[in-house]
C-alpha cells in the first residue's frame, strides 16, 4: 500500500495517543502528525516512546488557519479526529466549552480539510452516548440507524459534531467515515475516568466514589481493540458510512470497582457512595455486527485480561499518573486547566 500521511487530532490524549502508537508500529512507512492543544487531558508524555517517529504540532481544531496550514505543510491525506472534550460532569458545569470544541471545533476542522484539498478520508470518532440511554432491564441495543436522543451537554455536543461531519459529506463531497464507540479503557487514560480513578485511588487506599445508581451499566472495550477498528475503517470502510465499535461486554460501575479491588487485593470498604450527577445515563450497548460483517473486525482482548493488564500498568507507572493527580488548579487558558478530583468520576 502507498504510504499515507495522517493527521491525528487529539493525538496526545488517551485514545489518540494509543492510536498514534498503534499506527506507527503497524504502518512504519506512514507519516503521522499528532495534533493537540494540550489542554488538561493532553499529555506529551503519552507519546514519549514514539516521539522520534512522528511529528507533533500543538494546535487547536477550532483554529481554521492553523489547522489548514498544518494540513498543507504536511501534505496530509487522512485526518483522524479524536479531539474532543469528553468529561460529562464538566460539561454540566460549562456546556459552552463543550459545544465550542466538539461542534464548532469539528466544523472548523472539516472546513480546513475542505480548503486544504487532497483529503482521501476524514474519519471522525464519536460515542454511543449520542443515542441517549437504554433501560437496565432489557436486551435492547443501539444500531447505526438508531435515532439520536442525547440527554446531556456532552452527548448533545458529540451529536452535533456527527451531524457536521455528515453535512460536509452530503454538501461538499468530503470523503468521511464515522465510528461510534463504547467506553474505552487501557494505559494512558487520564485519571478523571472511572477505571484509572478507581485504580489510582485504590493503590493509595483512598475511597472509590460510586454514584448512587450503582446498577448503571456500560459496555467496555480495550483501547487497542478500538485502534484496530479505526484501522479497519480507514483501510476498508465505505465512504459516508457509520460503524459501531463495541465489545458486547457489559459491566456495572460497582462490578468495575470489585474487579479493581480484587486485582489489587484491597478491601471492599474502600467503596463509597457519592451523589449522582444530572442526566446520568443508565445503560449503553452497541450493535457492532456491521463492522464485523463488512470489515471482519471484532474485539479480541478478553475483559478480564485487559483489566488485569490495565491495573498492572497503573501500578507500574505511578510516575506517569501521580503528577496528574497532584496538579493544582491553574488559570483558564493555560495548558492544564482542571485538577483531578479524587472524589469525582466520569463515565
List the predicted regions and their residue ranges:
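The catalytic Tyr-centered alpha-helix of NAD(P)H-dependent dehydrogenases
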Residues: 139, 150-157, 187, 191-195, ...
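Hydrophobic alpha-helix immediately C-terminal to the catalytic Tyr-X-X-X-Lys motif of short-chain
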Residues: 160, 164-168, 198, 256, ...
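Generic structural signal for helix capping and beta-alpha/helix-loop junctions
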Residues: 42, 132, 186, 218, ...
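N-terminal Rossmann-like NAD(P)+-binding domain of SDR-like oxidoreductases, especially those catalyzing
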Residues: 1-184, 309, 314-319, 323-347
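C-terminal substrate-binding subdomain of Rossmann-fold SDR/epimerase-dehydratase oxidoreductases
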Residues: 19, 59-62, 196, 202-347
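Residues that form or flank phosphate/diphosphate-binding pockets in enzymes
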Residues: 15, 41-42, 65, 189, ...
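Short aromatic-enriched loop/helix-cap "lid" or pocket-rim segments at secondary-structure transitions
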Residues: 44-47, 134-138, 189-192, 256-258, ...
Amino acid at each position: 500500500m502507498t504510504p499515507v500521511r495522517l493527521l491525528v487530532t487529539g493525538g496526545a490524549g488517551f485514545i489518540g495517543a494509543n492510536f498514534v502508537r498503534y499506527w506507527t508500529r503497524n504502518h512504519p512507512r506512514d507519516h503521522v502528525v499528532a495534533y493537540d492543544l494540550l489542554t488538561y487531558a493532553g499529555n506529551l508524555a503519552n507519546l514519549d516512546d514514539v516521539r522520534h517517529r512522528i511529528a507533533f504540532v500543538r494546535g487547536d481544531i477550532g483554529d481554521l488557519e492553523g489547522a489548514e496550514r498544518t494540513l498543507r505543510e504536511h501534505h496530509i491525506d487522512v485526518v483522524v479526529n479524536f479531539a474532543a472534550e469528553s468529561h460529562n460532569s464538566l460539561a454540566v458545569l460549562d456546556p459552552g466549552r463543550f459545544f465550542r470544541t466538539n461542534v464548532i471545533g469539528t466544523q472548523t476542522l472539516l472546513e480546513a480539510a475542505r480548503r486544504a484539498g487532497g483529503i482521501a478520508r476524514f474519519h471522525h470518532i464519536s460515542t454511543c452516548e449520542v443515542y441517549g440511554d437504554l433501560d437496565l432491564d432489557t436486551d435492547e441495543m443501539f444500531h447505526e440507524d438508531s435515532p439520536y436522543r442525547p440527554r446531556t451537554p456532552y452527548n448533545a455536543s458529540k451529536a452535533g459534531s456527527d451531524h457536521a461531519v455528515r453535512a460536509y459529506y452530503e454538501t461538499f463531497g468530503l470523503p468521511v467515515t464515522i465510528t461510534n464507540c463504547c467506553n474505552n479503557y487501557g494505559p494512558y487514560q487520564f485519571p478523571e475516568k472511572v477505571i484509572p480513578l478507581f485504580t489510582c485511588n485504590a493503590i493509595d487506599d483512598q475511597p472509590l466514589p460510586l454514584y448512587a445508581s450503582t446498577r448503571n451499566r456500560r459496555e467496555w472495550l480495550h483501547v487497542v481493540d478500538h485502534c484496530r477498528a479505526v484501522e479497519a475503517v480507514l483501510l476498508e470502510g465505505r465512504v459516508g458510512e457509520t460503524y459501531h465499535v463495541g465489545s458486547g461486554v457489559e459491566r456495572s460501575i460497582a462490578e468495575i470497582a470489585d474487579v479493581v479491588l480484587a486485582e489489587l487485593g484491597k478491601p471492599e470498604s474502600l467503596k463509597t457512595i457519592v451523589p449522582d450527577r444530572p442526566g446520568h445515563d443508565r445503560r449503553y450497548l452497541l450493535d457492532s455486527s456491521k463492522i464485523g460483517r463488512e470489515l471482519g473486525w471484532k474485539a479480541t482482548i478478553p475483559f478480564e485480561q485487559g483489566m488485569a493488564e490495565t491495573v498492572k500498568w497503573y501500578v507500574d507507572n505511578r510516575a506517569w499518573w501521580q503528577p496528574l493527580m497532584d496538579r493544582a488548579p491553574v488559570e483558564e487558558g493555560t495548558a492544564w486547566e482542571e485538577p483531578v478530583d479524587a472524589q469525582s468520576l466520569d463515565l
